[in-house]
Amino acid sequence: ELLQIAKPFLTSGGHYLDIGANCGMTSFGLCTPQTQEHCTFHLFEANPDLIPILHETAQHYESFDLRIVHGCIASKPGTSRLCRRIEHTGAAYVGEEGDVAVNNLCLDDYIAENKIERIPLAKIDIEGFELHALRGMRDSMEKGRVEAVILEIAPPWLNRQGHRPADIFEFLADTGYRCFFFRSDDPNRSSESARVEVHGTVLHVYPVEHAHIEGQTDVIAFHESAYFQ
């Protein structure tokens, strides 16, 4: 379902940020004939064990513009310690007890250094560290360069970092975004749906009406300047 909702955003080209790329399933799944010529994929991954896997898989997509970046997407420069789980590489998280130090990367700096003007979509799934990533991209978000964001909301993982779902929603509202649930089976969604047109495709989404989240879910946030003016 995530791939289906992400595809329309890239039909007009631009840069896709995959923050917490893991093995690259989302990015490689979006490598289609429609995105081959006009899209650049930026795959950010903190776990050093996954970087060789991403490079190996990328060899099968040589006609696509894929950029694999090793680093911990954070709100400030420095280093973070990463707690790795051998049995589940995608569940690595930032914590003081981490066994490996990873250099931090602030997305505002990366976006400026690479002269990126338009990001139709960013996906963020970094095991509770999402708010740090958002804070490190605040300037780009406030300016509307990031037109939409899909991110995981997992209360236990957020709590591990001292954050709540409400903190995420407040940040997104402050930077000019409206948040929606999009999974058809999401128990958090309201009965009232909304229609948002993305480059000719109509998405049926459900407004986030409160910050109490049941279980683990994903939300999509649209910048008002791109979709509501």
Segments the model singles out, each with a brief description of its role:
Residues E1-Q229:
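Phosphate/nucleotide-binding beta-alpha loop and adjacent structural elements of enzyme active sites
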